[in-house]
Amino acid sequence: FELAPVSGAALTGGTNGEITGTSYQNYLDKIESYAYNTMGVVTTDEVIKRLYVSFNKRLRDEMGIKFQLVVYDYPKADYLGVISIKNKCLDGVYKGDDGKKVYPNEAAAVYWTTGAEGGCKVNASVQNRAYDGEYTVEAEYTQAELIAAVKAGEFVFHSVNDDIRVLDDINTMVSTTDTFGDVFKDNQTIRVCDQIANDDALVFANKYIGRVPNDEPGRNALWMDLVKINQELQKLRAIENFKDTDVVVYQGDTKKSVVVEMAVTPV
């Protein structure tokens, strides 16, 4: 038989389960073994946000699994792997019993931002991209408020004539060090670094572990593969000023370990 396209068909017979803290933890347990660029969690619960930020930090820093996390209103993460959206969504707002406004879809901008960041090319940025999501984003800010938001590490939408656009493609990192300077506040920098880390790990796992001896010819072959990855990124204009001498591969402390040192300059 032939399938016909259908738009807006309602599903029937289903029920909504209760989402609990255990549900969020179960998801993290399941997703840990998968590869992805960006994860989003749509919640206003501070405990859940803290759980996901801790997960992101653990995987990035301890396991070398590189991805960025998109959350709503959590700039205190102060971390290059976490993107915090400032804007609330206004859809469905109502007054509660106490007379205060309640925003049931307050964190819904996470949906669009997660897709935009996850689908962004390694040589591109989400900066100044027009918002075309289905939710109504609150975006009326003064210039002083926008400047303060960027300084605080907030990913913010703002009004530009008749459009709503991303002001700057930044993460929550505001505390810099000698190792991690201002350039790491830019999500394009993180995309490039994550792409290299993930590609290098994939090549090493698929071609070298258990297959190629850790001797000079084997390490030279690995060096050539890693150089090729960076050369391709330079062709894409994701990095610049790359030289093959920027990659160094040598034996580690044990016969089974390899150390790679690499210098790259994201555009």
Language model features: what each stretch is:
Residues F1-V267:
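Surface-exposed assembly/interface segments
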